[in-house]
Amino acid sequence: GDAREAMRVRCASELPGCDLMALLGDLERSAVLSALARRGRRIDPAPWGKPLGRIEVVNLRVFQDSEGFLQFFNVFHATTRERVVEREVLVRPGERWDQQRIDESRRKLRDRTFSVLAVIVPVESATPGAVDALVVTRDVWSLRFDFNARVQGDKFSYLTFSLSENNFLGLRKLLAAVYEMDLGAVGIGPLYIDKNVLGRRYTLRTR
């Protein structure tokens, strides 16, 4: 609404009275409050221009306590490793807090293949004059079965299905077994996709 947009402008202009929590949706706010309580942290309301001290990651489970028996299925999901999330933050320790680069980092982390939620908030640092970053993420369920087919007349002109792990070993890499058939050929084999080769924003795709 108008109030949120006014607050967004205030924060973008780095003005006093900026409330970063007011810019979050309900699910994001709840996740951040839970992470703050878990780590004993407090929001830094004026991080701009301060050097970054630490980057701390809290990665929430796919199924939360409120989802009852579904929590059992968490054992079949490899939660994204903290170091994998941490390296996506473009502002590095020792550099000044830059909200534009923080926002870009958040957009990278919110890749829907891997995350349903990603928030980066400034928190008070133990180092005088510095600010720490608290990164809160929540994975999506990563085991997938995909199927696609096209029919011409009474036969398949194209057929493919795959079983994939979209977050292999918690590394944000995709590994799949794929069957693919068209009118001219049949193929079966593994598929590997890495969207962050050697920590850089390159994509590696191989079959």
Q: Could you tell me what each predicted segment is?
A:
Residues 1-207:
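Immediate N-terminus of the mature polypeptide
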